[in-house]
């Protein structure tokens, strides 16, 4: 195209030149090489760059952002890609097949001019990457419940699939925790107990202490009724109390092998610390991945509407009814977005009197919420105190049902509180005048706090009973030895009962509530009351809160009951199949799906809250409450944590000095300041990246406006040529 044709594209200048093709307009740089042409200065992107010229100096003033000469750029891109082919696969590049073939030919041509050593390195690198890809593909086929989860995703979409993927993650997490405890604690004991290795137990040398603190009463071995075994199995007492399931079984100081002595108290404590640290790192890693996805998906409201309308369909759905459900869920999400938009507009238009009235009502309703929580916590406290006092005094005088009720009274009260309070919160929040999305988040937050705080209330109630007594026993032993001769085992029994009772409730609700409800809705369709009752919905947030509750129990109880992670693994495996059967045959997906269910970020965030709440009572138990003197591996230590300073004292003096220096305040304060500076740096870096992302989004918008502008000018030029 000549210079005159370039000027013909200016507004109001007719032209007799041939028609201009878009590919020539975008690729041929000669058409914009003449200095008098000022057409490109009219592009929206060029005007934006002119306004930001102080920050963008590398832009070409004549060619804007789109219309640069592309021949040299393409050749440089090809050379760069060809050079990097040795470290990246061709499939990673966004190129068509012909370009990939051309680049492959370039690579083969370059290989001929390399030395034999470089050729061997290239081929070995390719072979190793190909092997890793094949191994990665094979591991995906070995993934637990892969076909089941894919089937659920195909029938019910990605929302419900995320719950089952989260459940699979908890199964794997508990399995790894159990393997850590098994390798560090159980395996040395089993090898010695069954004479598998040439080793022996090192008994704990009892120090000079009051004999009253070392008394551990053994249950009577007289006539035992059959139902006593059922009670023992459900409560962890009796024959289970003396097994390796609980803390009191490990009353040894170590295991002596041929060449060394295995320090069991240290291994017992380190297994708990390692389990919690692994859980924290694993959850944070997966949370960061989900947070990255949420950052990528963060968008403006207009973009959110466009994405839901043009890209909101889930192509994994193959079932007709699920497709209808997806239609309704998209419709609900659009309604929710519009409702939130109306709510924002309503908030902006509120008068000062309405604002005062709304906030006063919210304050009053939040006081009611706090009163409900306080009543639940007090009920758990009273039930725990009543159960602990009567369990030791009158347990032999009770019949089977009364005995079981006393043992499970705290678990029953906690389950009732977890069942009733969500319904109360759902009724209260309707009057607080929040947006629909915030209503869901606030309700879930209250339910999370309720479920997890009940466990903490139970543990702290037990702790208060353990450390308080009426006589001088607490002065002698440091704890209530008369009521709790081995208090760690009894705390483990409470966690065991919570785990078993939660599992029984899940099975009972599925088999005796959901299944009969499905039968009534199916075969009694003429009854209007039953049809109004309807089929049970598969509520994702409620199910997630249930398994997070069970996992929090497992974290707290793993120190007091080392086999509890194995029980939790079996429990979650059974729950997976029960929930899958319930989803397929008794439940229907909720027509109002939780929006964060498309990613596991929210689930992992709730799980992280549960882990933090579990660490608090464990830290207090390990560092503050005196260890039992009648059972367990820490009978010669005032607290469990004292095994760490004792072990450090056996190290060489130089290593001791280093450890004491690292753990001192002189090191901790500067280290904390450096960490804060690094954190501030990354926060500033994230802010800069965010600003760059905003600029790039603006630039993308300007690129599209450039295209529209060019098409408009091209159309005008073609119209002028026809005229």
UniProtKB/Swiss-Prot annotation:
Phosphoserine: which positions carry it? 89
Instruction: Give the Cytoplasmic membrane side ranges.
Output: 190-219, 285-362, 426-494, 577-601, 687-723
Q: Which residues lie on this side of the membrane: Extracellular?
A: 1-168, 241-263, 384-404, 516-555, 623-665
Q: Name one GO molecular function term.
A: mechanosensitive monoatomic ion channel activity
What keywords is this UniProt entry annotated with?
Answer: Glycoprotein, Membrane, Phosphoprotein, Transmembrane, Transmembrane helix
Q: Does the keyword Ribosomal protein apply?
A: no
Q: Report how it sits in the membrane.
A: Multi-pass membrane protein
Q: Which GO terms describe its biological process?
A: sensory perception of mechanical stimulus
Subcellular location(s): the record lists: Membrane
Q: Where is the segment annotated Disordered?
A: 1-28, 51-71
> What Pfam families does the annotation carry?
TMC
Membrane-crossing residue ranges in chain numbering: 169-189, 220-240, 264-284, 363-383, 405-425, 495-515, 556-576, 602-622, 666-686
Taking the first listed entry, what is the main subcellular location of this protein, grouped into a coarse class?
A: membrane
> Is-annotated flag, keyword Glycoprotein?
yes
Q: Which purpose does this protein serve, as stated in its record? A: Acts as an inhibitory modulator of PIEZO2 mechanosensitive channel in dorsal root ganglion (DRG) neurons through physical interactions or interference with the interaction between PIEZO2 and the cytoskeleton.
Q: Give the record's subunit note.
A: Interacts with PIEZO2; the interaction inhibits PIEZO2-conducted mechanically activated currents.
Name the protein family: Belongs to the TMC family.
The protein's name: Transmembrane channel-like protein 7
Q: Could you tell me which species this protein originates from?
A: Homo sapiens (Human)
